[in-house]
């Protein structure tokens, strides 16, 4: 409840021994509505552990967990022109730093299709992640490529993403961790 509606927070998932097993971003969508992202490969494990904790550690909580992994696609637009590109795609969304600071989200729409736009970054660059129903992802992808043409937009893959995040000191669980590291070992004691 400390996370304000419309805000996002990066977090680590720890085993009972305090070792890091996953990470992700939790966003507060409404008074009692959150969405949590995880690593792609860790989603099922995180959901299982949260369900276990709800039954064994927090049975008094009135919380329901639902996986929506296959319902949404995410298109990340990064770099120095990301704001201009997103503005062309969603012209009525105020992207000013005052209205849309880092680690926040806004509900919006692209050509009448509802979406969530998050100002978060795994690359360390100025970025927006557009969450859209999966059946619209191809169309929104094509729109983003068209909107970015004048800025020489270029798709990037996981190898580029890994290099960019490494330059910023961001971890990849399972690659930079092996189940034997705590947040302190990773020099991330600021998160504890």
Feature-to-residue mapping (PLM):
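Acidic, proline/glycine-enriched N-terminal capping motif
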Residues: 1-13, 19
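Short secondary-structure transition/capping motifs
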Residues: 2, 15, 35-39
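Detector for glycine-centered tight turns/loop "hinges" at secondary-structure junctions
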Residues: 17-18, 112
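Glycine-rich, Trp-frequent "lid" loop and neighboring beta-strands that shape
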Residues: 25
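Conserved, structured C-terminal
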Residues: 29-192
């Amino acid at each position: 409840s400390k996370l304000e509606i419309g805000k996002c927070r990066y977090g680590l998932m720890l085993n009972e021994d305090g070792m890091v097993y996953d990470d992700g971003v939790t966003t507060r969508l409404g008074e009692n509505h959150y969405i949590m992202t995880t690593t792609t490969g860790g989603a099922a494990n995180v959901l299982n552990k949260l369900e276990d904790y709800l039954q064994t550690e927090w049975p008094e909580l009135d919380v329901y967990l639902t996986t929506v992994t296959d319902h949404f696609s995410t298109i990340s637009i990064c770099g120095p022109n990301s704001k201009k590109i997103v503005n062309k795609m969603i012209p009525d969304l105020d992207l000013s730093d005052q209205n849309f600071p880092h680690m926040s989200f806004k509900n919006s729409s692209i050509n009448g299709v509802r979406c969530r736009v998050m100002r978060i970054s795994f690359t360390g660059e100025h970025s927006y992640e557009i969450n859209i129903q999966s059946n619209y992802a191809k169309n929104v992808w094509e729109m983003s490529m068209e909107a970015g043409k004048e800025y020489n937009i270029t798709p990037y893959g996981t190898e580029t993403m890994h290099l960019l995040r490494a330059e910023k000191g961001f971890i990849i669980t399972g690659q930079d961790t092996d189940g034997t590291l705590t947040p302190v070992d990773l020099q991330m004691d600021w998160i504890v």
